[in-house]
Amino acid sequence: MRMLYFSKHLALTCIGLAAIFATNAQAVEQIKPQVDASALPALGWHEPNPLRGNAEAAAIGKAAFNQSCAVCHGQDAIGTRSPAPDLRRIGMGCRRIQDAALRQRCQGDADAFFIKSVRYGKQKFGIVHMPPWEGLLAPELAWALRSFVETAPKGTGIQSLSPTAAATQ
């Protein structure tokens, strides 16, 4: 009898929490970034990232990120204290792969995961964890975001707050 009472209350609590999280997750307003992306070449949604290593694309991506993505993923992609995942971790393990062909394949998989998440968003059990951005972001701007995230400083984010780190950047 006591177990049934506990199970009933646990189920009601879970339903209540799911409703709260669903409301909060869907409450994030999508803001289309207002950046000049005219320097970027017209691209499609293909992988791997065609703008990898392009410093100008990374700078455009940083501006767009801080306008549209930082509210969930942290300013300058420093997502260690943010409600959403730290995007700098996507493909992090690829850097340790010694074989160039395998490393390139790993980066391609990470690019595919990133771009699919941006285009279609993330939804689990009816809860929107990330809204879809297809239609709001052009493919070239999405790839610029990826280029920025790949070049964003790694670490805890605490270093970026120190005056010494800011002076060396």
Which positions does each model-derived feature cover?
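Bacterial N-terminal signal peptides
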Residues: A11-I20
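N-terminal secretory signal peptides that target proteins for export/translocation
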Residues: M1-F6
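Electrostatic cytochrome c docking/interface patches
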Residues: I31-A64, T168-Q169
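Gly/Gly-Pro-rich "capping" loops immediately C-terminal to redox-active cysteine motifs
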Residues: A58, K62, G74, I78-R119, ...
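Sequence/structural segment immediately N-terminal to covalent heme-attachment motifs in c-type
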Residues: N54-I78, F114-K116, L145, S162-T164, ...
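Axial heme c-ligation environment in periplasmic c-type cytochrome domains
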Residues: A27-K32, R81-R89, S117-A152, G157-Q169
